[in-house]
Amino acid sequence: MQQVLENLTELPSSTGAEEIDLIFLKGIMENPIVKSLAKAHERLEDSKLEAVSDNNLELVNEILEDITPLISVDENVAELVGILKEPHFQSLLEAHDIVASKCYDSPPSSPEMNIPSLNNQLPVDAIRILGIHKKAGEPLGVTFRVENNDLVIARILHGGMIDRQGLLHVGDIIKEVNGHEVGNNPKELQELLKNISGSVTLKILPSYRDTITPQQSYVNMERHPAHVRQVFVKCHFDYNPFNDNLIPCKEAGLKFSKGEILQIVNREDPNWWQASHVKEGGSAGLIPSQFLEEKRKAFVRRDWDNSGPFCGTISNKKKKKMMYLTTRNAEFDRHEIQIYEEVAKMPPFQRKTLVLIGAQGVGRRSLKNRFIVLNPARFGTTVPFTSRKPREDEKDGQAYKFVSRSEMEADIKAGKYLEHGEYEGNLYGTKIDSILEVVQTGRTCILDVNPQALKVLRTSEFMPYVVFIAAPELETLRAMHKAVVDAGITTKLLTDSDLKKTVDESARIQRAYNHYFDLIIVNDNLDKAFEKLQTAIEKLRMEPQWVPISWVY
Protein backbone atom coordinates (compact mmCIF):
# COMPACT_ATOMS: atom_id res chain seq x y z
CA MET A 1 0.00 0.00 0.00
CA GLN A 2 2.81 2.41 0.84
CA GLN A 3 4.42 1.82 -2.56
CA VAL A 4 1.11 2.53 -4.31
CA LEU A 5 0.66 5.77 -2.33
CA GLU A 6 4.17 6.92 -3.24
CA ASN A 7 3.51 6.29 -6.94
CA LEU A 8 0.06 7.94 -7.08
CA THR A 9 1.53 11.30 -8.11
CA GLU A 10 2.96 9.74 -11.30
CA LEU A 11 -0.22 7.92 -12.34
CA PRO A 12 -2.15 10.70 -14.19
CA SER A 13 0.50 11.21 -16.86
CA SER A 14 1.38 7.55 -17.27
CA THR A 15 -2.07 5.94 -17.22
CA GLY A 16 -4.53 8.71 -18.02
CA ALA A 17 -6.34 8.15 -14.73
CA GLU A 18 -8.92 10.77 -13.68
CA GLU A 19 -7.70 13.13 -10.96
CA ILE A 20 -10.88 12.73 -8.87
CA ASP A 21 -10.47 8.93 -8.91
CA LEU A 22 -6.90 9.23 -7.65
CA ILE A 23 -7.95 11.63 -4.90
CA PHE A 24 -10.67 9.20 -3.82
CA LEU A 25 -8.24 6.23 -3.94
CA LYS A 26 -5.70 8.15 -1.87
CA GLY A 27 -8.37 9.00 0.70
CA ILE A 28 -9.35 5.33 1.05
CA MET A 29 -5.77 4.06 1.33
CA GLU A 30 -4.86 6.70 3.93
CA ASN A 31 -7.91 5.83 6.03
CA PRO A 32 -6.72 4.44 9.42
CA ILE A 33 -9.36 1.68 9.30
CA VAL A 34 -8.12 0.45 5.91
CA LYS A 35 -4.51 0.51 7.13
CA SER A 36 -5.48 -1.53 10.20
CA LEU A 37 -7.28 -4.07 8.03
CA ALA A 38 -4.23 -4.37 5.77
CA LYS A 39 -1.95 -4.99 8.77
CA ALA A 40 -4.35 -7.60 10.16
CA HIS A 41 -4.50 -9.30 6.75
CA GLU A 42 -0.70 -9.45 6.53
CA ARG A 43 -0.43 -10.89 10.04
CA LEU A 44 -3.04 -13.56 9.32
CA GLU A 45 -1.31 -14.47 6.06
CA ASP A 46 2.07 -14.78 7.80
CA SER A 47 0.77 -17.01 10.58
CA LYS A 48 -1.38 -19.31 8.48
CA LEU A 49 -1.18 -22.86 9.93
CA GLU A 50 -1.13 -26.03 7.90
CA ALA A 51 -1.28 -29.61 9.18
CA VAL A 52 2.03 -31.49 8.78
CA SER A 53 0.25 -34.79 8.17
CA ASP A 54 -3.25 -36.24 8.20
CA ASN A 55 -2.26 -39.91 8.84
CA ASN A 56 -0.73 -39.66 12.32
CA LEU A 57 -2.80 -42.53 13.75
CA GLU A 58 -1.51 -44.85 11.04
CA LEU A 59 2.05 -43.65 11.69
CA VAL A 60 1.76 -44.31 15.46
CA ASN A 61 0.49 -47.86 14.81
CA GLU A 62 3.54 -48.52 12.62
CA ILE A 63 5.81 -47.21 15.40
CA LEU A 64 4.10 -49.53 17.90
CA GLU A 65 4.77 -52.53 15.66
CA ASP A 66 8.46 -51.62 15.54
CA ILE A 67 9.05 -50.93 19.25
CA THR A 68 6.74 -53.47 20.95
CA PRO A 69 9.39 -56.29 20.80
CA LEU A 70 11.73 -54.00 22.79
CA ILE A 71 9.44 -53.66 25.83
CA SER A 72 11.32 -56.28 27.85
CA VAL A 73 14.69 -54.71 27.05
CA ASP A 74 14.01 -51.03 27.93
CA GLU A 75 11.65 -49.55 30.55
CA ASN A 76 11.41 -46.29 28.59
CA VAL A 77 10.09 -48.17 25.58
CA ALA A 78 7.48 -49.85 27.77
CA GLU A 79 6.35 -46.45 29.09
CA LEU A 80 6.17 -45.00 25.55
CA VAL A 81 4.10 -47.95 24.30
CA GLY A 82 1.68 -47.42 27.18
CA ILE A 83 1.26 -43.74 26.28
CA LEU A 84 0.79 -44.39 22.57
CA LYS A 85 -1.86 -47.06 23.26
CA GLU A 86 -3.77 -44.81 25.69
CA PRO A 87 -7.37 -44.47 24.35
CA HIS A 88 -7.43 -40.69 24.96
CA PHE A 89 -4.20 -40.24 23.00
CA GLN A 90 -5.50 -42.45 20.18
CA SER A 91 -8.74 -40.41 20.07
CA LEU A 92 -6.75 -37.16 19.98
CA LEU A 93 -4.74 -38.36 16.98
CA GLU A 94 -7.89 -39.56 15.24
CA ALA A 95 -9.58 -36.18 15.76
CA HIS A 96 -6.46 -34.38 14.45
CA ASP A 97 -6.39 -36.53 11.30
CA ILE A 98 -10.08 -35.90 10.63
CA VAL A 99 -9.65 -32.13 10.94
CA ALA A 100 -6.44 -32.13 8.89
CA SER A 101 -8.04 -34.11 6.07
CA LYS A 102 -11.21 -31.97 6.31
CA CYS A 103 -13.33 -35.10 6.13
CA TYR A 104 -16.34 -34.55 8.33
CA ASP A 105 -19.30 -36.85 8.82
CA SER A 106 -22.74 -35.37 9.27
CA PRO A 107 -23.77 -35.44 12.92
CA PRO A 108 -26.47 -37.92 13.83
CA SER A 109 -29.91 -36.42 13.55
CA SER A 110 -31.33 -35.60 16.95
CA PRO A 111 -34.89 -36.48 17.83
CA GLU A 112 -37.37 -33.79 16.86
CA MET A 113 -37.88 -31.36 19.70
CA ASN A 114 -41.26 -29.93 20.49
CA ILE A 115 -40.43 -26.20 20.39
CA PRO A 116 -43.40 -23.93 20.97
CA SER A 117 -44.07 -21.33 18.29
CA LEU A 118 -42.60 -17.93 19.01
CA ASN A 119 -45.97 -16.46 18.16
CA ASN A 120 -47.57 -18.28 21.10
CA GLN A 121 -47.77 -16.59 24.46
CA LEU A 122 -44.42 -16.77 26.26
CA PRO A 123 -44.29 -18.79 29.48
CA VAL A 124 -44.03 -17.02 32.81
CA ASP A 125 -40.47 -18.24 33.38
CA ALA A 126 -39.37 -16.26 30.26
CA ILE A 127 -39.46 -13.02 32.30
CA ARG A 128 -35.97 -11.60 32.83
CA ILE A 129 -34.56 -9.28 35.49
CA LEU A 130 -31.92 -6.83 34.27
CA GLY A 131 -29.79 -4.39 36.22
CA ILE A 132 -28.23 -1.21 34.84
CA HIS A 133 -26.39 1.70 36.43
CA LYS A 134 -27.03 5.29 35.31
CA LYS A 135 -26.70 8.93 36.33
CA ALA A 136 -29.68 11.22 36.89
CA GLY A 137 -30.63 12.93 33.63
CA GLU A 138 -28.63 10.49 31.49
CA PRO A 139 -30.84 9.17 28.67
CA LEU A 140 -31.09 5.43 28.15
CA GLY A 141 -31.46 5.84 24.39
CA VAL A 142 -34.81 4.06 23.93
CA THR A 143 -38.35 5.03 23.00
CA PHE A 144 -41.56 3.22 23.91
CA ARG A 145 -44.97 2.55 22.41
CA VAL A 146 -48.19 1.07 23.77
CA GLU A 147 -49.04 -2.36 22.39
CA ASN A 148 -51.88 -4.49 23.81
CA ASN A 149 -51.90 -2.23 26.88
CA ASP A 150 -48.20 -2.97 27.51
CA LEU A 151 -45.21 -0.64 27.18
CA VAL A 152 -42.98 -2.03 24.43
CA ILE A 153 -39.54 -0.84 23.32
CA ALA A 154 -40.19 0.85 19.95
CA ARG A 155 -36.59 1.66 19.02
CA ILE A 156 -33.09 1.63 20.47
CA LEU A 157 -30.94 4.63 19.58
CA HIS A 158 -27.57 3.84 18.06
CA GLY A 159 -24.68 4.60 20.44
CA GLY A 160 -26.92 5.08 23.50
CA MET A 161 -26.49 3.31 26.84
CA ILE A 162 -28.88 0.46 26.03
CA ASP A 163 -27.38 -0.02 22.57
CA ARG A 164 -23.85 -0.24 24.02
CA GLN A 165 -24.87 -2.77 26.68
CA GLY A 166 -26.99 -4.89 24.33
CA LEU A 167 -29.30 -6.06 27.14
CA LEU A 168 -32.61 -4.92 25.67
CA HIS A 169 -34.11 -5.38 22.21
CA VAL A 170 -36.86 -3.83 20.13
CA GLY A 171 -40.16 -5.48 21.07
CA ASP A 172 -39.22 -6.25 24.70
CA ILE A 173 -42.07 -5.49 27.12
CA ILE A 174 -41.23 -3.46 30.23
CA LYS A 175 -43.20 -4.84 33.20
CA GLU A 176 -41.57 -3.21 36.25
CA VAL A 177 -38.94 -0.61 37.18
CA ASN A 178 -37.33 -1.07 40.61
CA GLY A 179 -40.20 -3.34 41.68
CA HIS A 180 -43.00 -0.95 40.62
CA GLU A 181 -45.36 -1.65 37.72
CA VAL A 182 -44.94 0.84 34.88
CA GLY A 183 -48.51 1.25 33.64
CA ASN A 184 -49.08 2.14 29.99
CA ASN A 185 -47.96 5.78 29.59
CA PRO A 186 -44.73 6.11 27.55
CA LYS A 187 -44.07 9.72 28.63
CA GLU A 188 -44.34 8.87 32.33
CA LEU A 189 -41.93 5.95 31.89
CA GLN A 190 -39.46 8.17 30.00
CA GLU A 191 -39.54 10.77 32.81
CA LEU A 192 -39.17 8.08 35.47
CA LEU A 193 -36.13 6.50 33.79
CA LYS A 194 -34.59 9.90 33.07
CA ASN A 195 -34.69 11.03 36.71
CA ILE A 196 -33.57 7.75 38.31
CA SER A 197 -29.92 7.56 39.35
CA GLY A 198 -27.75 4.70 40.56
CA SER A 199 -28.87 1.11 40.19
CA VAL A 200 -31.99 0.45 38.08
CA THR A 201 -33.70 -2.95 38.02
CA LEU A 202 -35.96 -3.76 35.06
CA LYS A 203 -38.34 -6.67 34.78
CA ILE A 204 -38.94 -7.41 31.10
CA LEU A 205 -40.68 -9.92 28.91
CA PRO A 206 -38.25 -10.56 26.00
CA SER A 207 -39.53 -10.37 22.46
CA TYR A 208 -37.24 -13.16 21.17
CA ARG A 209 -37.19 -11.41 17.80
CA ASP A 210 -34.19 -11.48 15.50
CA THR A 211 -32.47 -8.20 16.24
CA ILE A 212 -30.62 -6.18 13.63
CA THR A 213 -27.62 -4.22 14.78
CA PRO A 214 -27.43 -0.58 13.77
CA GLN A 215 -24.39 -1.39 11.64
CA GLN A 216 -26.61 -3.73 9.59
CA SER A 217 -29.28 -1.09 9.08
CA TYR A 218 -27.43 1.85 7.56
CA VAL A 219 -29.45 3.90 5.14
CA ASN A 220 -29.88 2.58 1.64
CA MET A 221 -29.73 5.84 -0.28
CA GLU A 222 -31.22 4.45 -3.47
CA ARG A 223 -28.18 3.45 -5.49
CA HIS A 224 -25.78 1.74 -3.07
CA PRO A 225 -26.36 -1.16 -0.66
CA ALA A 226 -26.84 0.04 2.90
CA HIS A 227 -24.47 -2.43 4.54
CA VAL A 228 -21.54 -1.71 2.23
CA ARG A 229 -20.69 1.84 3.30
CA GLN A 230 -21.40 4.51 5.84
CA VAL A 231 -23.94 7.15 4.84
CA PHE A 232 -23.56 10.88 5.49
CA VAL A 233 -25.97 13.69 4.61
CA LYS A 234 -25.83 17.47 4.47
CA CYS A 235 -28.90 19.09 6.04
CA HIS A 236 -30.75 21.81 4.15
CA PHE A 237 -33.01 22.96 6.99
CA ASP A 238 -32.85 23.74 10.71
CA TYR A 239 -34.42 21.29 13.14
CA ASN A 240 -35.22 21.44 16.85
CA PRO A 241 -37.01 18.35 18.23
CA PHE A 242 -38.54 20.36 21.09
CA ASN A 243 -40.51 22.35 18.50
CA ASP A 244 -41.73 19.21 16.72
CA ASN A 245 -45.15 17.96 17.79
CA LEU A 246 -44.88 14.76 15.73
CA ILE A 247 -41.69 13.29 17.22
CA PRO A 248 -42.42 10.29 19.49
CA CYS A 249 -39.96 11.47 22.17
CA LYS A 250 -38.59 15.03 22.17
CA GLU A 251 -35.65 14.10 24.44
CA ALA A 252 -34.57 11.45 21.91
CA GLY A 253 -34.47 13.96 19.05
CA LEU A 254 -31.29 15.35 17.50
CA LYS A 255 -31.05 19.10 17.00
CA PHE A 256 -29.16 20.30 13.92
CA SER A 257 -28.67 23.40 11.79
CA LYS A 258 -28.70 23.99 8.06
CA GLY A 259 -25.40 22.95 6.48
CA GLU A 260 -24.42 20.43 9.20
CA ILE A 261 -23.18 16.94 8.26
CA LEU A 262 -24.94 13.98 9.90
CA GLN A 263 -24.19 10.26 9.79
CA ILE A 264 -27.34 8.20 9.25
CA VAL A 265 -27.12 5.00 11.30
CA ASN A 266 -30.64 3.56 11.07
CA ARG A 267 -33.58 4.02 8.71
CA GLU A 268 -35.88 1.16 9.68
CA ASP A 269 -38.67 3.55 10.68
CA PRO A 270 -40.08 5.21 7.53
CA ASN A 271 -40.77 8.45 9.44
CA TRP A 272 -37.90 8.72 11.91
CA TRP A 273 -34.27 8.06 11.10
CA GLN A 274 -31.45 7.74 13.62
CA ALA A 275 -28.44 9.99 13.05
CA SER A 276 -25.45 11.47 14.87
CA HIS A 277 -23.35 14.62 14.43
CA VAL A 278 -20.14 13.99 12.50
CA LYS A 279 -18.31 16.98 13.98
CA GLU A 280 -19.45 16.65 17.60
CA GLY A 281 -19.84 12.87 17.76
CA GLY A 282 -21.96 11.39 20.56
CA SER A 283 -24.86 8.97 20.49
CA ALA A 284 -27.54 8.97 17.83
CA GLY A 285 -30.87 10.77 18.00
CA LEU A 286 -34.10 10.86 16.02
CA ILE A 287 -34.51 13.10 12.98
CA PRO A 288 -37.44 13.33 10.55
CA SER A 289 -36.99 11.11 7.52
CA GLN A 290 -36.80 12.44 3.98
CA PHE A 291 -40.34 11.17 3.39
CA LEU A 292 -41.83 12.79 6.49
CA GLU A 293 -40.14 16.17 6.03
CA GLU A 294 -41.03 16.32 2.33
CA LYS A 295 -44.62 15.54 3.25
CA ARG A 296 -44.67 18.36 5.80
CA LYS A 297 -43.14 20.90 3.43
CA ALA A 298 -45.02 19.90 0.27
CA PHE A 299 -48.47 20.86 1.50
CA VAL A 300 -49.77 24.42 1.82
CA ARG A 301 -52.91 25.58 3.61
CA ARG A 302 -55.92 26.51 1.47
CA ASP A 303 -56.59 30.23 1.23
CA TRP A 304 -60.07 29.78 2.66
CA ASP A 305 -59.07 27.32 5.40
CA ASN A 306 -59.67 28.81 8.86
CA SER A 307 -60.53 25.63 10.71
CA GLY A 308 -57.27 25.50 12.68
CA PRO A 309 -54.52 22.88 12.78
CA PHE A 310 -55.27 19.17 12.51
CA CYS A 311 -52.93 16.46 13.78
CA GLY A 312 -52.30 13.52 11.50
CA THR A 313 -54.59 14.58 8.67
CA ILE A 314 -54.16 16.32 5.35
CA SER A 315 -57.86 16.69 4.58
CA ASN A 316 -57.69 20.49 4.62
CA LYS A 317 -54.47 20.79 2.63
CA LYS A 318 -53.76 21.13 -1.04
CA LYS A 319 -50.71 20.73 -3.23
CA LYS A 320 -49.57 23.53 -5.49
CA LYS A 321 -49.48 22.24 -9.06
CA MET A 322 -47.28 23.76 -11.73
CA MET A 323 -46.29 22.65 -15.20
CA TYR A 324 -42.54 22.85 -15.80
CA LEU A 325 -41.79 25.41 -18.49
CA THR A 326 -38.29 26.54 -19.43
CA THR A 327 -39.54 30.11 -19.43
CA ARG A 328 -40.56 29.68 -15.78
CA ASN A 329 -37.42 27.86 -14.68
CA ALA A 330 -36.72 30.27 -11.80
CA GLU A 331 -40.30 29.99 -10.54
CA PHE A 332 -40.07 26.19 -10.59
CA ASP A 333 -36.77 26.31 -8.66
CA ARG A 334 -38.43 28.42 -5.98
CA HIS A 335 -40.74 25.50 -5.12
CA GLU A 336 -38.02 22.84 -5.14
CA ILE A 337 -37.95 20.99 -1.80
CA GLN A 338 -34.50 20.27 -0.40
CA ILE A 339 -34.24 18.15 2.76
CA TYR A 340 -31.05 16.06 2.90
CA GLU A 341 -28.25 15.61 0.39
CA GLU A 342 -26.01 12.56 0.54
CA VAL A 343 -22.35 13.54 0.67
CA ALA A 344 -18.90 11.92 0.88
CA LYS A 345 -15.71 13.10 2.58
CA MET A 346 -12.81 13.79 0.25
CA PRO A 347 -9.17 14.68 0.91
CA PRO A 348 -8.11 18.29 0.17
CA PHE A 349 -8.16 19.14 -3.54
CA GLN A 350 -8.50 22.15 -5.83
CA ARG A 351 -11.99 22.74 -7.20
CA LYS A 352 -12.30 23.01 -10.96
CA THR A 353 -14.57 26.05 -10.86
CA LEU A 354 -15.33 28.91 -8.47
CA VAL A 355 -18.90 30.11 -9.06
CA LEU A 356 -19.95 33.52 -7.73
CA ILE A 357 -23.72 33.95 -7.40
CA GLY A 358 -25.49 37.16 -6.45
CA ALA A 359 -27.78 39.98 -7.48
CA GLN A 360 -26.67 42.50 -10.08
CA GLY A 361 -24.40 45.15 -8.59
CA VAL A 362 -23.18 43.29 -5.46
CA GLY A 363 -19.53 43.15 -6.58
CA ARG A 364 -19.12 39.70 -8.12
CA ARG A 365 -17.21 40.94 -11.15
CA SER A 366 -14.87 43.05 -8.99
CA LEU A 367 -13.99 40.01 -6.87
CA LYS A 368 -13.48 37.82 -9.94
CA ASN A 369 -11.17 40.33 -11.63
CA ARG A 370 -9.11 40.84 -8.47
CA PHE A 371 -8.45 37.09 -8.14
CA ILE A 372 -7.36 36.76 -11.77
CA VAL A 373 -5.11 39.84 -11.70
CA LEU A 374 -3.36 38.81 -8.45
CA ASN A 375 -2.86 35.15 -9.39
CA PRO A 376 -3.29 34.47 -13.13
CA ALA A 377 -1.42 31.15 -12.83
CA ARG A 378 -4.11 29.72 -10.52
CA PHE A 379 -7.28 31.44 -11.73
CA GLY A 380 -8.80 32.14 -15.11
CA THR A 381 -12.18 32.85 -16.64
CA THR A 382 -14.09 32.40 -19.88
CA VAL A 383 -14.36 34.77 -22.82
CA PRO A 384 -18.04 35.29 -23.71
CA PHE A 385 -19.36 34.75 -27.23
CA THR A 386 -21.48 37.32 -29.08
CA SER A 387 -23.22 37.63 -32.43
CA ARG A 388 -22.62 41.39 -32.77
CA LYS A 389 -20.02 42.80 -35.12
CA PRO A 390 -16.64 43.72 -33.58
CA ARG A 391 -15.86 47.39 -33.10
CA GLU A 392 -12.75 48.99 -34.62
CA ASP A 393 -10.60 48.65 -31.48
CA GLU A 394 -11.77 45.12 -30.58
CA LYS A 395 -9.81 41.94 -31.29
CA ASP A 396 -11.43 38.53 -31.47
CA GLY A 397 -10.77 36.45 -28.33
CA GLN A 398 -9.92 39.33 -25.96
CA ALA A 399 -13.12 40.81 -24.53
CA TYR A 400 -15.41 38.73 -26.77
CA LYS A 401 -15.35 35.92 -29.28
CA PHE A 402 -17.32 36.96 -32.35
CA VAL A 403 -19.45 34.46 -34.27
CA SER A 404 -22.38 34.73 -36.65
CA ARG A 405 -25.90 34.77 -35.28
CA SER A 406 -26.85 31.62 -37.20
CA GLU A 407 -23.87 29.72 -35.76
CA MET A 408 -24.65 30.91 -32.25
CA GLU A 409 -28.34 29.99 -32.54
CA ALA A 410 -27.39 26.50 -33.76
CA ASP A 411 -25.01 25.98 -30.81
CA ILE A 412 -27.65 27.24 -28.35
CA LYS A 413 -30.14 24.76 -29.80
CA ALA A 414 -27.53 21.99 -29.45
CA GLY A 415 -27.07 22.79 -25.72
CA LYS A 416 -23.49 24.01 -26.03
CA TYR A 417 -24.10 27.18 -23.99
CA LEU A 418 -24.22 27.33 -20.20
CA GLU A 419 -26.28 30.52 -20.38
CA HIS A 420 -27.22 33.06 -23.03
CA GLY A 421 -29.26 36.21 -23.52
CA GLU A 422 -30.08 38.95 -25.98
CA TYR A 423 -29.21 42.64 -25.64
CA GLU A 424 -30.00 45.33 -28.21
CA GLY A 425 -30.67 42.70 -30.85
CA ASN A 426 -27.41 40.78 -30.30
CA LEU A 427 -26.86 37.41 -28.62
CA TYR A 428 -24.36 36.96 -25.77
CA GLY A 429 -23.46 33.75 -23.96
CA THR A 430 -20.96 31.52 -22.14
CA LYS A 431 -19.98 28.30 -23.87
CA ILE A 432 -19.52 25.14 -21.80
CA ASP A 433 -16.39 24.13 -23.72
CA SER A 434 -14.73 27.45 -22.83
CA ILE A 435 -15.01 26.52 -19.12
CA LEU A 436 -13.36 23.15 -19.72
CA GLU A 437 -10.54 24.81 -21.69
CA VAL A 438 -9.59 26.86 -18.60
CA VAL A 439 -9.82 23.79 -16.34
CA GLN A 440 -7.59 21.75 -18.65
CA THR A 441 -4.79 24.30 -18.14
CA GLY A 442 -4.75 23.40 -14.42
CA ARG A 443 -6.40 26.64 -13.32
CA THR A 444 -9.65 27.23 -11.43
CA CYS A 445 -12.23 28.82 -13.72
CA ILE A 446 -14.06 31.70 -11.98
CA LEU A 447 -17.64 32.26 -13.18
CA ASP A 448 -20.22 34.91 -12.30
CA VAL A 449 -23.38 33.39 -13.75
CA ASN A 450 -27.11 33.31 -13.16
CA PRO A 451 -28.19 30.91 -10.38
CA GLN A 452 -30.16 28.75 -12.84
CA ALA A 453 -26.80 27.65 -14.31
CA LEU A 454 -25.96 25.82 -11.04
CA LYS A 455 -28.07 22.85 -12.14
CA VAL A 456 -25.64 22.28 -15.02
CA LEU A 457 -22.46 23.17 -13.14
CA ARG A 458 -22.96 21.16 -9.93
CA THR A 459 -21.53 17.90 -11.29
CA SER A 460 -18.25 16.01 -11.10
CA GLU A 461 -17.31 17.47 -14.50
CA PHE A 462 -17.07 21.01 -13.08
CA MET A 463 -16.74 20.40 -9.29
CA PRO A 464 -17.77 23.95 -8.38
CA TYR A 465 -17.20 25.80 -5.12
CA VAL A 466 -20.33 27.95 -5.01
CA VAL A 467 -20.16 31.27 -3.16
CA PHE A 468 -23.16 33.55 -2.72
CA ILE A 469 -22.24 37.23 -2.56
CA ALA A 470 -25.10 38.69 -0.54
CA ALA A 471 -26.12 42.34 -0.66
CA PRO A 472 -25.76 44.28 2.60
CA GLU A 473 -28.58 46.28 4.18
CA LEU A 474 -29.99 49.15 2.13
CA GLU A 475 -28.26 51.86 4.20
CA THR A 476 -24.86 50.18 3.83
CA LEU A 477 -25.37 49.64 0.09
CA ARG A 478 -26.32 53.30 -0.32
CA ALA A 479 -23.15 54.43 1.50
CA MET A 480 -20.96 52.05 -0.58
CA HIS A 481 -22.43 53.35 -3.84
CA LYS A 482 -21.87 56.97 -2.78
CA ALA A 483 -18.23 56.17 -1.93
CA VAL A 484 -17.43 54.71 -5.39
CA VAL A 485 -19.19 57.61 -7.13
CA ASP A 486 -17.27 60.19 -5.06
CA ALA A 487 -14.00 58.37 -5.81
CA GLY A 488 -14.71 58.54 -9.54
CA ILE A 489 -14.69 54.74 -9.91
CA THR A 490 -18.11 54.86 -11.60
CA THR A 491 -20.24 57.53 -13.20
CA LYS A 492 -23.43 55.48 -13.11
CA LEU A 493 -25.84 56.88 -10.54
CA LEU A 494 -28.29 54.50 -8.89
CA THR A 495 -31.52 55.58 -7.25
CA ASP A 496 -32.86 54.24 -3.95
CA SER A 497 -35.31 52.22 -6.01
CA ASP A 498 -32.40 50.57 -7.90
CA LEU A 499 -30.57 49.79 -4.66
CA LYS A 500 -33.71 48.34 -3.06
CA LYS A 501 -34.17 46.10 -6.11
CA THR A 502 -30.65 44.77 -5.54
CA VAL A 503 -31.38 44.00 -1.87
CA ASP A 504 -34.71 42.33 -2.70
CA GLU A 505 -33.22 40.31 -5.56
CA SER A 506 -30.38 39.16 -3.30
CA ALA A 507 -32.86 37.90 -0.70
CA ARG A 508 -34.92 36.11 -3.36
CA ILE A 509 -31.87 34.30 -4.79
CA GLN A 510 -30.75 33.23 -1.31
CA ARG A 511 -34.18 31.77 -0.50
CA ALA A 512 -34.45 29.84 -3.76
CA TYR A 513 -30.89 28.56 -4.17
CA ASN A 514 -29.49 28.43 -0.63
CA HIS A 515 -29.02 24.64 -0.81
CA TYR A 516 -26.46 25.06 -3.61
CA PHE A 517 -24.21 27.46 -1.68
CA ASP A 518 -20.96 26.32 -0.04
CA LEU A 519 -20.30 29.77 1.42
CA ILE A 520 -22.24 33.02 1.94
CA ILE A 521 -20.37 36.35 2.14
CA VAL A 522 -22.16 39.63 2.83
CA ASN A 523 -20.32 42.23 0.74
CA ASP A 524 -20.45 45.27 3.02
CA ASN A 525 -16.75 45.90 2.36
CA LEU A 526 -15.04 44.73 -0.83
CA ASP A 527 -11.59 44.25 0.74
CA LYS A 528 -12.96 42.20 3.64
CA ALA A 529 -15.15 40.16 1.30
CA PHE A 530 -12.08 39.37 -0.84
CA GLU A 531 -10.10 38.26 2.23
CA LYS A 532 -12.92 35.96 3.38
CA LEU A 533 -13.19 34.40 -0.07
CA GLN A 534 -9.42 33.97 -0.35
CA THR A 535 -9.26 32.27 3.06
CA ALA A 536 -12.06 29.87 2.12
CA ILE A 537 -10.34 28.88 -1.14
CA GLU A 538 -7.04 28.23 0.63
CA LYS A 539 -8.82 25.94 3.13
CA LEU A 540 -9.96 23.75 0.23
CA ARG A 541 -6.31 22.89 -0.44
CA MET A 542 -5.59 22.01 3.20
CA GLU A 543 -8.75 20.54 4.76
CA PRO A 544 -10.98 17.57 3.82
CA GLN A 545 -14.17 18.46 1.96
CA TRP A 546 -17.72 17.12 1.95
CA VAL A 547 -18.93 16.85 -1.64
CA PRO A 548 -22.09 15.40 -3.28
CA ILE A 549 -21.97 11.61 -3.42
CA SER A 550 -22.49 11.75 -7.21
CA TRP A 551 -19.01 13.29 -7.56
CA VAL A 552 -17.44 10.15 -6.08
CA TYR A 553 -19.56 7.19 -7.28
Curated annotation (Swiss-Prot):
Gene Ontology CC, one term: plasma membrane
Record domain SH3: where: 228-297
Domain named PDZ: residues: 129-208
One GO MF term: guanylate kinase activity
Main location: membrane
Entries under SUPFAM superfamilies matching the protein: L27 domain (SSF101288), P-loop containing nucleoside triphosphate hydrolases (SSF52540), PDZ domain-like (SSF50156), SH3-domain (SSF50044)
Record keywords: Membrane, Phosphoprotein, Repeat, SH3 domain
Bilayer topology annotation: Peripheral membrane protein
Assembly information from the UniProt record: Interacts with CADM1. Interacts with the LIN7 proteins.
The protein, known as: Protein PALS2
Organism: Mus musculus
